[in-house]
From Swiss-Prot:
It comes from Bacillus subtilis (strain 168). This is SPbeta prophage-derived uncharacterized protein YopF. The lineage of its organism: Bacteria, Bacillati, Bacillota, Bacilli, Bacillales.
Length: 71
């Protein structure tokens, strides 16, 4: 199965921010609560953002790697 795309997202503690990813013929569809800024392709950047959120806002978040494959 070839890998189409991969990226990282931040999943917040309240879980209301991160819902789900769906893929259709036109591309990615995301839940209304997920903003484009949360789709990050660089692991260093996602670690910096998560660290800053923890330091400045006391927000816990986890990094999720999303891999999209074609069957």
């Amino acid at each position: 199965m070839p890998l189409i795309d991969y990226f990282y997202v931040l999943q917040f503690e309240n879980k209301e921010y991160f819902k789900a990813f769906k893929l259709d013929e036109s591309g990615y569809l995301t839940s209304s609560d997920l903003h484009e800024a949360s789709k990050i392709h660089n692991m260093l950047e996602v670690i910096e953002v998560a660290s800053e959120l923890k330091t400045k806002c006391n927000v816990q978040c986890e990094v999720r790697e999303i891999q999209v494959v074609k069957r």
